[in-house]
A protein has these predicted regions:
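Active-site-adjacent substrate-binding region
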Residues: 219, 226-228, 232-249, 401-444
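Acidic, glycine-rich active-site loops and adjacent beta-strand->loop/helix elements
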Residues: 77-79, 140-148, 170-173, 212, ...
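Active-site metal-coordination/substrate-binding segment of hydrolases
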Residues: 65-163, 189, 203, 325-342, ...
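Zn-dependent metallopeptidase/amidohydrolase metal-coordination segment
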Residues: 12-13, 336, 343-358, 422-477
Length: 485
């Protein structure tokens, strides 16, 4: 049995442990939905699944608290399925194996799922508790947040009654988030007719791995390497100098994760193999030098593979490579009025080329709607010039901060009373569901907070143990001090 069961507060960690025993990668919500629904009904609470697949559980106010504003406790049930290249794990079937490393809880070779499993676990602890004081509560556990916030988008007006929403999906304890970035998925596609490799050519598969990856919003400001952007530098030079031709490319697998790995199959004249291998080694050394202060050692390797039946036609190949090379990636602009806060960014997240089809997916973020439009139009122009069809989907506005929020003032006072310091009040460069839910329920007073997590969306994801108690104690105190209606 996992040692996390011995951690405090036990009522939170026991529920988180239960969540690690239920496969819940984005897109596969059946088991976790059934589990949460059974949990709520087992407590004798009104529990149901709405049309969008969200689980909603209602808990009445405790005696004497009926005159308090209703609170919606919100988290998402899915987790990002990322694993190390050498880890054997089927996220649809296998359980998450946790372990304790000093003050951190980690998973063995996979994402931990603390994003947002610890938020869900805290909600479960509150629903189960019989000794807490609180007003009317509604738990809203949304589906498929990580792949497009589909549960939040599908929420119908009138489903919930609360006036305050506490989103438990932030990742730095001691910080209260009052605003977030909006986003847009940009997808460029192209179909082509493959051509046969030249006679006498050989095929080489190059693989780039070992990058840190991470959350494409929270960690985009750190300048971490993007596997697709590194690989295109090599491929472009191989085409220009060694007559290489592109047969296929696979890089990244999640729209909101900085790609950690990418590989491509290229064909070259046999006599250029030695020079190509030299370029691989040169690029490996160069990338490690450029990112020595940021990345763990980057691995770039090459191996002979069977010659593919087809490859990308030369003109289309050159246009694709130029577009990938030119594509904006990383921070575009900081918020001028908020120090050290990213306003606008993009993540060249997923590239799939081969078999007569090319698809490139980018997630653009901005807390400014006008800058989001500027960035997405720039990306559209970049890939349109390469002859690709570009679609914009999944767009959502940011959450505009309200510094006069009643729940913000109450929580700031409560935090200082509990811990002796003021909490930091921030805007986050990530797509919290608050923006979407707030548009569906106008006037909702919202705050996002949570325990400290690091490297979410990557196998390095970890949760800082002492902050989980502080987070839960603060949540309980907030519920006890909910403003009057």
């Amino acid at each position: 049995m996992s040692t996390i069961l011995s951690l405090a507060p036990q009522n939170v960690w026991k529920h988180f442990y239960s969540l690690t025993q239920i496969p819940r990668p984005s897109g596969h919500m059946e088991k976790i939905t059934e589990f949460l629904l059974g949990f709520g009904k087992g407590l004798g609470l009104e529990s149901f699944v709405d049309e969008a697949g969200n689980v909603i559980i209602r808990k009445p106010a405790t005696p004497g608290m009926e005159n308090r504003k209703g609170v919606i406790l919100q988290a998402h049930m899915d987790m990002v399925p990322q694993k190390n290249n050498d880890t054997v794990h089927d996220f649809e079937k296998d359980l998450i194996e946790t372990y304790i490393d000093g003050d951190w809880v980690k998973a063995k070779g996979t994402t931990l799922g603390a994003d947002n499993g610890l938020g869900v676990a805290a909600i479960m602890a509150v629903l189960e508790a019989k000794d807490l004081k609180h007003g009317p509560l509604e738990a809203l556990v949304t589906k498929d947040e990580e792949t497009g916030m589909y549960g939040a988008f599908g929420l119908k007006p009138g489903t919930l009654n609360g006036e305050i929403l506490l989103n438990l999906d932030s990742e730095d304890e001691g910080e209260l988030y009052i605003g977030c970035a909006g986003g847009m998925d940009v997808t460029a596609t192209l179909e082509y007719k493959e051509v046969a490799p030249e006679a006498g050519d050989i095929a080489v598969k190059v693989t780039l791995k070992g990058l840190r990856g991470g959350h494409s919003g929270l960690e985009i400001n750190e300048g971490r390497a993007n596997a697709n952007k590194l690989l295109v530098r090599f491929v472009r030079e191989a085409v220009a100098s060694y007559e290489a031709r592109l047969a296929s490319w696979e890089g990244g697998n999640m729209r909101n994760a900085i790609p950690r790995e990418a590989h491509a199959v290229i064909t070259i004249p046999a006599e250029n193999e030695e020079e190509l291998l030299g370029l691989v080694k040169y690029c490996e050394n160069l990338f490690n030098e450029e990112y020595s202060a940021i990345e763990t050692p980057i691995s770039f390797t090459a191996e002979r593979v069977e010659l593919p039946a087809g490859e990308v036609p030369e003109e289309i190949q050159d246009n694709l490579i130029d577009a990938i090379f030119a594509c904006q990636n990383g921070v575009t602009r900081m918020i001028p009025t908020v120090p050290d806060t990213v306003e606008t960014s993009s993540n060249l997240a997923i590239i799939t080329i081969g078999g007569g089809k090319a698809a490139i997916k980018i997630l653009a973020r901005s807390s400014s709607d006008s800058m989001k439009e500027y960035l997405t139009t720039s990306l559209e122009s970049c890939f349109s010039m390469a002859g690709m069809k570009v679609e914009m989907t999944g767009g959502y506005s940011g959450w505009q901060p309200d510094v006069n929020s009643p729940i913000l003032h109450a929580m700031k006072a409560s935090y200082k009373q509990q811990f002796g310091v003021e909490p930091a009040v921030k805007v986050i460069h990530a797509g919290l569901e608050c923006g979407i839910i707030g548009a569906i329920i106008p006037g909702l007073d919202m705050i996002s907070f949570g325990p400290t997590l690091r490297s979410p969306h990557s196998p390095d994801e970890r949760a800082l143990i002492p902050t989980v108690r502080k987070f839960y104690d603060f949540l309980v105190a907030t519920l006890e001090q909910t403003p009057l209606k």
